[in-house]
């Protein structure tokens, strides 16, 4: 029997100076993540920013925040390890933060 899924707040910063690489890899990253999103395992996600940009300026993304429903923190680490953003050196896996979370 599978364990009950629990919610976790996941924050993973980008490595320095990878904004251009992030933009190139965004489409394959989103395609790979789509099954988890469609299954309701990732009900919320977005980019963290270095600062808010003025209208028309490039958005200064510097990481990702998401809610992941998983059996364990180890399962989340495995999901993040296999993501193209980790494999191709966008996310700083060593600075991954996983927090137990409860949506309200």
From Swiss-Prot:
Pathway field: Mycotoxin biosynthesis
Functional description taken from the UniProt entry: Part of the gene cluster that mediates the biosynthesis of fusaric acid, a mycotoxin with low to moderate toxicity to animals and humans, but with high phytotoxic properties. L-aspartate is suggested as fusaric acid amino acid precursor that is activated and further processed to O-acetyl-L-homoserine by cluster enzymes aspartate kinase FUB3 and homoserine O-acetyltransferase FUB5, as well as enzymes of the primary metabolism.
Phenotype of gene-disrupted mutants: Does not alter fusaric acid production.
Annotated Gene3D superfamilies: Dimeric alpha+beta barrel (3.30.70.1060)
Family of the protein in this entry: Belongs to the YciI family.
Official protein name in the record: Fusaric acid biosynthesis protein 2
Pfam families associated with the record: YCII (PF03795)
Source organism superkingdom: Eukaryota
Organism for this UniProt entry: Gibberella moniliformis (strain M3125 / FGSC 7600) (Maize ear and stalk rot fungus)
Biotech exploitation of the protein: Fusaric acid is phytotoxic to plants such as cotton and banana. It has been shown to induce programmed cell death in plants. In addition to a mild toxicity to animals, fusaric acid exhibits acanthamoebicidal, antioomycete, and antimycobacterial activities.
Induction remarks: Expression is positively regulated by the secondary metabolism regulator LAE1.
């Amino acid at each position: 029997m599978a364990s009950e899924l629990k919610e976790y707040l996941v924050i993973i910063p980008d490595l320095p100076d990878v904004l251009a690489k992030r933009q190139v890899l965004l489409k394959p990253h989103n395609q790979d993540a789509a099954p988890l999103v469609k299954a309701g395992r990732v009900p919320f996600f977005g980019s963290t920013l270095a600062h808010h940009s003025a209208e028309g300026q490039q958005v200064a993304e510097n990481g990702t925040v998401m809610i992941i429903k998983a059996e364990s923190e180890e399962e989340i680490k495995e999901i993040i390890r296999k993501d193209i953003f980790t494999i191709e050196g966008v996310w700083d896996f060593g600075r991954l933060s996983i927090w137990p979370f409860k949506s309200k």
